[in-house]
Swiss-Prot record:
Binds 1 [4Fe-4S] cluster. This is NADH-quinone oxidoreductase subunit B 1. The gene is nuoB1. Its main location: membrane. It catalyses: a quinone + NADH + 5 H(+)(in) = a quinol + NAD(+) + 4 H(+)(out).
């Protein structure tokens, strides 16, 4: 930070003018209102404290000091869906539980997002039976899929960053009086496809008994 002082009645000189111009350039931010709203939303996603099964343990681990999810502005866990805008479906979704999950989702604030965490939430996992929903996307609009059984907390954080990138590029009306009443959602890229070349080039794999 730079600053300068002038005496009362003193004429500002050229060096001070240059300093003020430089200061204005560093501190004045110009842009569209929608861009600022999207920036604020993507950096202040409030997750709903909700879990279903084993993957919830890994989700809770992501909020510990080791992983420090506060870096992404998502450390504010909400105990009620009316104050949250993100729900992480972490675990097995049974048919009897699906209406309750949908009811909780309907109470969330707009705009709201869904992360499907784990194989059971993504596709039913190993439970190919009548009592388990074969994919939470059959009744909820899923924004990000996090694979694994269960996924590591690092994978959830990577999914959160992927969600933030898509939220930052979404366009939504700021008022019912302005523009169409739809939300232009951006399809998140597939990280499996993005990392394919890097994985193919790997020649040394870590030992399975290490972390």
């Amino acid at each position: 930070m730079r600053w300068s002082l002038t005496r009362p009645g003193e004429e500002p000189g050229t060096p001070r003018d240059a300093t003020m111009t430089e200061t204005v350039k560093r501190n004045l931010v110009m842009g569209r209102l929608q861009d600022f709203v999207s920036w604020g939303q993507k950096n202040s996603i409030w997750p709903f404290n909700f879990g279903l099964s084993c993957c919830y343990v890994e989700m809770a681990t992501a909020f510990t000091s080791k992983y420090d999810i506060a870096r992404f502005g998502s450390e504010v866990l909400r105990a009620t869906p009316r104050e949250a805008d993100l729900i992480v479906i972490s675990g097995t979704v049974f048919v009897k539980m699906a209406p309750i999950v949908k009811y909780l989702y309907d109470q969330m604030l707009e705009p709201r997002w869904v992360i499907s965490m784990g194989s059971c939430a993504n596709s039913g996992g190993m439970y190919d039976i009548y009592s388990v929903v074969q994919g939470v996307d059959s009744f909820l609009p899923v924004d990000v899929y996090v694979p694994g059984c269960p996924p590591r907390p690092d994978a959830l954080l990577e999914g959160l960053m992927l969600l933030q990138d898509s939220v930052g590029t979404q366009r939504r009306p700021l008022s019912w009086m302005v523009g169409p009443q739809g939300v232009e959602r951006v399809t998140p890229p597939s990280l499996r496809d993005a990392k394919r070349d890097q994985r193919r080039a790997a020649q040394t794999l870590r030992s399975p008994d290490t972390i």
